[in-house]
């Protein structure tokens, strides 16, 4: 039986690296991508050194040409994808409200957190269509919830709300071919989350890996701790 194949973006550290590790330990072949080539290769080498089937590809999700090259490379080898985990993202908000956030900050945040995942999902869809159980997992945030929204981090929150709507749209348009879900990993102790966060990276990765691997996952939902939450 062929190994299942996943690609995880923004996987040079934190939740991304942990998702790669957990998938690879389930005997998956995992493609680890990162914008920072040195950090990405080191993360890949560390995991491969444990006997895990992990390969590195450099990817800047804000660069359409880079996305196109990656899609062409993956078309040649391995020629198929089962799961895309859109994990790469940025938190660039200054300590100010939406009335004072700069358009440049909003634009750059949207490029990384929304346009990048959208373009990558479109580019890799032909490879996902070759799978008999394809999935896209979009790593979102509770800050993107319209039902529970509050002030703070406006650029990040807006970008994650857009990512959630992308999930809804793709889930409907790809129904029967690719299952698409958003997931909130919670407040995780990463470079983005900070040392005061309440969750380990292992816990943060848990629902992402569940959406990638469990045979009974839903479609078009927002998930936290393996349970559906409101948009």
Model regions: which residues?
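A glycine-rich helix->loop->beta "capping" turn
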Residues: 50-53, 73-86, 92-94, 179
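Conserved glycine-rich Rossmann-like NAD(P)H-binding loop of the short-chain dehydrogenase/reductase
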Residues: 26-42
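Canonical Rossmann dinucleotide-binding motif of NAD(H)/NADP(H)-dependent dehydrogenases/reductases
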Residues: 1-31
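Short-chain dehydrogenase/reductase
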Residues: 71, 121, 167, 205-208
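Catalytic loop of short-chain dehydrogenase/reductase
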Residues: 90-110, 115-118, 122, 129-176
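The beta1-alpha1 cofactor-binding region of Rossmann-like NAD(H)/NADP(H)-dependent oxidoreductases
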Residues: 37-38, 58-72
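C-terminal helical subdomain
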Residues: 175-176, 182-188, 194-231
